[in-house]
Each structure stands twice: as structure tokens, then as C-alpha cells.
Design a protein with these regions (language model features):
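Conserved blade-register residue in beta-propeller folds
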Residues: 23, 171-173
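Acidic, metal/cofactor-coordinating or nucleic-acid-engaging core segments within structured domains
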Residues: 202-205
């Protein structure tokens, strides 16, 4: 089992997405609902500070500040529960490695760090097991960059990186393996925008709202076991969304004749299935845990530098 432990501290990367929370080994939806008593219909509830939380039944809506309510804190505790369960660890000292959209990090980094560090000791119960975590530090990194940090050496010449999550698209230009800090952008063009477009067009055709899960699975797989009158509408919406993404990239001076394109995040599958790349030099990073893994590596490198 691969993970980083430095001087007795577990390094735990958490990618706080609007659609999903991703760690090195676990992925779950970002929905959270609190109950005063243990819910009868689930065995997957998290018990924390006197309340039960059902995690992952839906997605969290887009917010421009992830520290504005309690949800992302509870989702962080849930991420610790699920990742530590996978690692077979019930008590540890931890360094949390997290991130924010590129254009938000300057204004929100310190507030998000304080938000996640407000309790040094976190005690919770998950699947009948008690856990105790001492938060030693929280390190905050830019999204997108973290997902490719292990392969920057492969980014020869001019490259453009598009990290398409559920809420935002983070775009970064990379030249000879070095990110260009003046050419980083965040846009509200995440996968949810595609699903909203798809749902509205399906509603006009069918007269009923297609379940979110059906739309999501269609985008992930590139097809669905539905009547053609529905899949044709869904395909058209996905193709239009893909065109919107490419239009935005061209605004950022993407030129396929001289640049390579790398697409990652949940939206990578949409472009892979529904965009005609016309011979563009494009690679898709389909590991949706890549960013969380990158956060861990960046945090490990920081810890090592502090000790030199």
C-alpha cells in the first residue's frame, strides 16, 4: 500500500471537489447531511461531536469560498475516516495536504488553512471503529499543478493544462516543465455546467427531469442504455460543452499547432468521448485521485526542505 509517512506523520492528501472528495485511495461524493440519531437506512454514517453524518448521497453545490459553512470541514473528517480505514490506521499525527482553485489560492489560502486547523485533535467513529487524529499541519496548494507535479519533466516545449472538475476548470500554461504563474486561470466551467445544460435540454424533449446519476454516467462512459431520442440530446449537449471548453482554451491562446494539451479531472472523460480532437496532441489523465496524490508529494517535499 503506497502512502507517505514522514517522521511519524501521516501525509494525507484531500482534493475537496464540488462533485467528489478524493484521497489517494478513496473517492466519495461531496454531499453531507446531519442527523441527531443514527440513521436506520445506512451503515455508512460518520459519528462526530454528537451527530451522525451521512456522506456521499449527493453532490455539494458550487460555492466560491469552501470555508463559508461547515460542510467541507465535515467532509474532511469523512475523508480522514475513509482513507485511514483503508490504511488500517486508527490513531495518528497527520499533515493534511489540500488545495484550492488557482485563481482563489492567493485570497483564500490562509483562511482555508485556519478552517481546517481549528481543531488540533479530531475524534470520530466510523464503521464501529474509534479514531483519533492530531492535525500537525495543513498545507494548501494550487489545483491542477499538483496533479501533474510528478510528470512535469514530460512537459517539453509549450503545454496547456486543463483541470476540469465538477465546479471549475483550472487552466495553466507550462513551458519546458515550468508553470507560468502569469498564465493561470479559473473558470466556472466544471462538469456540472454540462449536466445542467443536458438536463434542461432533456426536460424540453421528455417533459421530465433525467436523474443526475444517469447524466453523470453517460458522460463518464460515453453512452447509456436509453432510447436514442434521449442519448442524441445528451450527446449533443456534451459536444457543445466540449466546444465551450475549447473556445475558452483558445481565449487563453491555446494553439494546437505549437502546444500540447493535457486534460485531467472528472471532465477529461467528456472531452475524450465527445470532442473531435482533429489530430491535436492531447493526453488525458484519467486518474481522478492524481491531484490528491500530488498534494501529498508536494507536502512531503516541503517537510523535507524544512529539515535541511
Amino acid at each position: 500500500m503506497e502512502h507517505y509517512n514522514y517522521n511519524g506523520k501521516e501525509i494525507i492528501g484531500i482534493d475537496h471537489g464540488f462533485g467528489n472528495i478524493k484521497c489517494r485511495h478513496v473517492v466519495f461524493r461531496s454531499g453531507v447531511k446531519a442527523y441527531d440519531s443514527e440513521p436506520a437506512m445506512t451503515s455508512d454514517a460518520l459519528f462526530y461531536e454528537g451527530k451522525y453524518y451521512v456522506i456521499g448521497e449527493d453532490h455539494k453545490g458550487f460555492v466560491s469560498d469552501k470555508s463559508q459553512d461547515e460542510d467541507y470541514y465535515i467532509l474532511t473528517v469523512a475523508a480522514l475516516a475513509k482513507e485511514l480505514e483503508f490504511r488500517h490506521i486508527t490513531e495518528c499525527e497527520a499533515v493534511l495536504a489540500v488545495g484550492l482553485p488557482i485563481q482563489w489560492i492567493g485570497a483564500q489560502k490562509e483562511a482555508f488553512r485556519k478552517y481546517l486547523m481549528r481543531n488540533e485533535l479530531i475524534e470520530f467513529r466510523y464503521h464501529g471503529q474509534d479514531y483519533l487524529v492530531r492535525i500537525d499541519d495543513v498545507q494548501v496548494f494550487p489545483q491542477g499543478f499538483a496533479g501533474v507535479v510528478q510528470r512535469l519533466g514530460d512537459f517539453k516545449g509549450l503545454n496547456i493544462l486543463a483541470d476540469i472538475g465538477n465546479g471549475t476548470m483550472n487552466t495553466m500554461l507550462i513551458k519546458d516543465g515550468k508553470p507560468m504563474s502569469s498564465r493561470c486561470y479559473t473558470d466556472k466551467l466544471g462538469v456540472e455546467q454540462c449536466i445542467i445544460r443536458m438536463s434542461n435540454e432533456l426536460l424540453a424533449v421528455s417533459g421530465f427531469a433525467m436523474p443526475y446519476d444517469v447524466c453523470e454516467d453517460f458522460l463518464r462512459r460515453g453512452n447509456a442504455d436509453l432510447a436514442e431520442k434521449y442519448t442524441s440530446v445528451m450527446r449533443k449537449a456534451a459536444e457543445e460543452y466540449s466546444d465551450t471548453i475549447l473556445t475558452k482554451l483558445r481565449e487563453y491562446e491555446f494553439n494546437p499547432e505549437i502546444m500540447r494539451l493535457t486534460v485531467m479531472g472528472g471532465g477529461a472523460c467528456i472531452l475524450k468521448h465527445f470532442w473531435n480532437d482533429d489530430g491535436c496532441r492531447v493526453q488525458y489523465i484519467e486518474d481522478i485521485c492524481a491531484t490528491a496524490k500530488g498534494y501529498e508529494l508536494l507536502a512531503l517535499n516541503n517537510l523535507k526542505r524544512r529539515d535541511t
